[in-house]
A protein has these predicted regions:
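Short, highly charged C-terminal tails/helix-capping segments
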Residues: 119-140
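Short secondary-structure boundary motifs at beta->alpha junctions and helix caps
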Residues: 10-20, 79-119, 123
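Generic preference for hydrophobic/aromatic residues in regular secondary structure cores
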Residues: 1-5, 65, 89
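N-terminal segment of the mature soluble domain
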Residues: 1-50
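Surface-exposed short loop/turn segments
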Residues: 31, 35-79
């Protein structure tokens, strides 16, 4: 598990000595997304998500928050043509300024990330400008 002391060394990540994630953060986020975003048999498009940040950030000695930052891209069925792109940045206050508080905050932040992605994907399909083109590109 990584953390950053924003009040002292904002650009330097550090690791908790005795705390580890059960799996790499990207895998944990992927599992949560698969649960929240059921496969849509009507779409041939793919979603690519790059996880840029999965860190507990301490703004003060006794307060922290989870930061989950990612880049989402909706890709055409074949090739790497990007049909839509979105940057996401989710923060969630940790209930305690320690590793276990960070876990709770990251769980909530990851769920919120999935909710925002679901809303974004639904919005793309119903967008007045460009939504039809994306629907045609993603049609099976």
């Amino acid at each position: 598990m990584q953390y950053r002391l924003e009040y002292a060394q904002p650009s330097q990540r550090q690791a908790y000595a005795e705390s580890r994630w059960a799996s790499p953060p990207a895998e944990l986020v992927e599992v949560g997304l698969r649960r929240m975003l059921p496969p849509d048999g009507r779409s041939a498009c793919r979603l690519r998500l790059d996880l840029d940040e999965f860190t507990q950030v301490y703004g003060t000695h006794d307060g922290s928050q989870a930061l989950v930052a990612a880049r989402a891209e909706l890709l055409a069925p074949r090739g790497d043509t990007v049909l839509a792109r979105r940057d996401l940045r989710i923060t969630e206050v940790a209930p305690r300024p320690d590793a276990s508080g960070g876990v709770v905050a990251h769980r909530t932040a990851s769920r919120r990330l999935a909710e925002e992605l679901a809303g974004w994907l639904a919005g793309i399909a119903s967008a007045p400008n460009g939504g039809d083109a994306i629907q045609r590109a993603c049609a099976r």
